A protein has these predicted regions:
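Carbohydrate-active catalytic/glycan-binding domains of CAZyme proteins
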Residues: 1-167
């Protein structure tokens, strides 16, 4: 559509963590912010206090959202054109609001609007606990052996880390 997009995490990693987006016709900018920023958050309402030094404080806790501290997203588009954001989040236990499971990962179904902005599928911006699954067919993943006696001449592909191609 002629735009370059930039997706950012704002608000630190605390309760007002969020995902924001900007776009520009030039990769070097200037970028205009999405008028509906943040596009994914756990904070009530569209407006929030950015760069608040108390971003870790529970004053931003939203009791209406199971997922808290939602931010740092990655864009995923399926071969069917479905769009998702995968992001960090936490699920605190009340009343202390401690996140004993640490940082977790969640997924949100998204869509592109006619005016070229990314939105959650339901036009809200609060991270959802459940989303509609993809229409992609299941793809069986080969099972990784549970035992290896290393008697072969080469290591199996499962020993290689991402971005390191086997020779």
């Amino acid at each position: 559509n002629g735009y370059y997009y930039i997706m950012c995490a704002e608000g630190g990693t605390g309760y007002n963590h969020c995902v924001t987006m900007g776009r520009s016709k030039n990769v070097w900018g200037p970028y205009e912010g999405d008028p509906m920023n943040p596009i994914v958050t756990s904070v009530s309402g569209i407006s929030y206090e950015r760069q608040d030094p108390d971003h870790l404080k529970p004053k931003y806790y939203n009791p209406d959202s199971v997922l808290q501290k939602s931010g740092h997203a990655s864009y995923v588009e399926t071969s069917l054109g479905e769009v998702y954001l995968v992001h960090l989040c936490a699920r605190p236990f009340a009343p202390e609001l401690r996140c004993t499971l640490g940082r977790e990962t969640a997924i949100q179904k998204m869509k592109w609007t006619e005016d070229g902005w990314l939105r959650m599928y339901d036009d809200d911006n609060l991270a959802k606990e459940y989303v509609e699954e993809s229409r992609l067919p299941e793809y069986p993943v080969p099972q990784i052996p549970s035992f290896d006696d290393f008697d072969g001449e080469e290591l199996g592909n499962w020993y290689y880390a991402p971005r390191i191609m086997p020779q």
